[in-house]
Design a protein with these regions (language model features):
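Peripheral, non-transmembrane regulatory/ligand-interaction domains of membrane transport proteins
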Residues: 1-136, 155, 159-164, 169
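Membrane-interface, cytosolic juxtamembrane amphipathic helix immediately N-terminal to a transmembrane helix
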Residues: 165-183
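Short helix-coil transition/hinge motifs at the ends and kinks of transmembrane helices
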Residues: 134-146
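General structural signal for secondary-structure boundaries
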Residues: 56, 146-147
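A glycine-rich, aromatic-flanked flexible loop/lid motif
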Residues: 120-124, 142-145, 171-174
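Alpha-helical heptad-repeat coiled-coil segments that mediate oligomerization/polymerization in large
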Residues: 93-96, 149, 156, 174, ...
Length: 183
């Protein structure tokens, strides 16, 4: 979870949070070295080309949320590979499928991923609703920044919805394979 203030993002996470560590490394790579450090540093280890620092704490929150959803996609890919293997095994005639415990665990993981994504989708939708209620900024630059924040928020929301769609498709696919196996 996050508490978003004008200039501060307060993340709430477990102690061993890989997302926090990954994003901290990404931020460090995007930050150019101080002029005094430049001479002592290898020029290839500077800032990542094309990387931008977040414009605000809200932008940082959305980037971290996007990284989290990217990890959901990776988890979905791993589950998909394993479920495809089991599905092929289930559909092979005259074979005895014996991996029921692992299959049920994978289904449970899919359900949990679906629930987490639904919670995040609800939170992001509430965030978007709150953004719509913000007073319009006076300056064109601030207005552009607000518009970019809304666009990035919708992008992350769509990213979450893609994960949910894939998870539900996998659930349906494996349930169909189990039904065919027993018919």
């Amino acid at each position: 979870g996050f508490a978003v203030f004008d200039q501060v993002l307060l993340p709430v996470h477990p102690e061993d949070c890989s997302v926090r560590d990954a994003y901290a490394a990404r931020l460090a790579a995007a930050t150019p070295p101080a002029p005094s450090e430049t001479a002592a540093r290898d020029p290839r280890s500077g800032a990542v080309a094309g990387a931008r620092s977040p414009a605000s704490s809200a932008d940082l929150m959305l980037r971290v949320a996007n990284l989290i959803v990217d990890q959901y996609l990776e988890l979905r890919r791993e589950l998909s590979r394993q479920l495809d293997h089991w599905q092929a095994e289930l559909l092979r005639p005259r074979t005895r499928f014996s991996n029921w415990g692992a299959l049920l665990d994978a289904r449970l993981n899919l359900h949990q991923l679906d629930e987490i994504c639904e919670d995040q989708r609800s939170a992001l939708q509430a965030w978007l609703d709150a953004l719509e209620g913000w007073a319009l900024p006076d300056s064109p630059a601030a207005l552009r920044e607000l518009d970019l924040l809304k666009v990035r928020s919708r992008d992350v929301l769509e990213h979450i919805e893609r994960v949910v769609h894939h998870v539900r498709r996998l659930e349906h696919s494996i349930e169909t394979a189990v039904q065919i196996h027993f018919s």
